[in-house]
């Protein structure tokens, strides 16, 4: 009787384990088919160039493939490194602008041309750095962390300093009081965005 019961239990478990193994293999097959080469979310500028229907894909310059995504990661790294270097140069330009602007407000108008020249160079470097960040290929995966992170703070501050940069340039000739307020907002938020990665 014990032998008969053991035999029946043994025979009943064989088909069950085979089904579990089949389900496991089926799950593995479907999971490999669903691997995406692009992250689930991208900035609209990245989607414009690097998305599945982006300009790089449609023009066939960088068709979506594993090999090309590896190349894109190298391009991304170089673009973000350049973004960082240009960011430091832009910050230095903003400091110089602060010194020159203060002298202008004190009545030293001999520095007006220098202030405008450095202002234009700083604006060009600012938007070049912003473009490198906004148009870099997207990361492999989207990392969404709960709570505050240095990258979230950097992006929030970028929204502030981007708006302040536009306001500073628009108000340069129109209204000195608001130009100064916009430039202080620009410098404060930009410096904080640079420093947020250091701490």
Regions found by a protein language model. Give the residues of each.
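Hydrophobic alpha-helical membrane-anchor/signal-helix detector
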Residues: 76-105, 114-137, 152-173, 179-199
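Juxtamembrane helix-capping/reentrant segments at transmembrane boundaries
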Residues: 145-153
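Bacterial Sec-dependent N-terminal signal peptides
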Residues: 1-20
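N-terminal targeting leaders of membrane proteins
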Residues: 16-113, 129-145
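Intrinsically disordered/low-complexity terminal segments and short unstructured peptides
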Residues: 4-5, 12, 29-31, 44, ...
């Amino acid at each position: 009787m014990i032998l008969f019961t053991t035999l029946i239990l043994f025979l009943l478990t064989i088909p069950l384990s085979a089904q579990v193994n089949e389900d496991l293999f089926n799950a593995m097959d479907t999971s490999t088919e669903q691997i995406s080469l692009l992250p689930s979310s991208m900035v609209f500028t990245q989607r414009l160039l690097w998305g599945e229907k982006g300009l790089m894909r449609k023009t066939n310059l960088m068709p979506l493939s594993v090999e090309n995504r590896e190349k894109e990661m190298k391009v991304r790294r170089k673009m973000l490194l350049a973004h960082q270097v240009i960011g430091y140069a832009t910050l230095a330009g903003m400091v110089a602008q602060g010194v020159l602007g203060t002298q202008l407000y004190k009545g030293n108008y001999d520095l007006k041309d220098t202030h405008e020249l450095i202002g234009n160079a700083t604006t060009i470097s600012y938007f070049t750095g912003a473009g490198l960040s906004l148009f870099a290929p997207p990361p492999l995966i989207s990392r969404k962390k709960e709570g505050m992170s240095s990258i979230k703070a950097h992006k929030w501050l970028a929204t502030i300093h981007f708006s302040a940069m536009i306001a500073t340039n628009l108000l340069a000739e129109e209204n000195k009081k608001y130009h100064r307020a916009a430039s202080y907002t620009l410098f404060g938020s930009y410096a904080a965005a640079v420093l947020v990665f250091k701490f």
